[in-house]
Amino acid sequence: DDAKFYYGADGKRVNYIGWQLIDGIYYYKEGNQFIRNQSKKIKGDWYLFDLQGKMVTGFSTPEITSEYDDNYYYYGNDGRRQFYTGWQLINGKWYYFDESSRAAKGWKTINGVKYYFETITKATDEYNNEYFVGNSDHFMYTGYGIIDGEFYYFDANGACQGIDTSYTG
């Protein structure tokens, strides 16, 4: 049987149904088992539970569940799936979501502007060049760009080639 049970500090099995807060982590119990390795609609909202049954927050990734479909979806701090579209500022970083609420990844052209997205880590290419998407203007630098008062040089693909101390603008 694939059942997983939890026991309280008193050594007794937890038998409650519904949301469970165990050691600061939320789980959801249905029948005699905790929901694991799947998304679940609960009272009108979608939640994702990992292989151990922990409620997921942040971006879904392949390591979280075997239900993963090679797309990134975002779950808020309360665990509810967010059905974002367009540009979203999350924890100080910009992300772009398509009409199906999937976070953009790889190269995308949006409103005629080319961007490179890596949803979980910084944007890089296969050569580990770094890319920069401006926090307010949503653009990809090519040529010289100023970031935090420093002059950087970006190649035609937007790959950062480093700080240029000789450039005066």
Stretch-by-stretch model annotation:
Residues 1-169:
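Extracellular adhesion/carbohydrate-binding repeat motifs centered on closely spaced tryptophans
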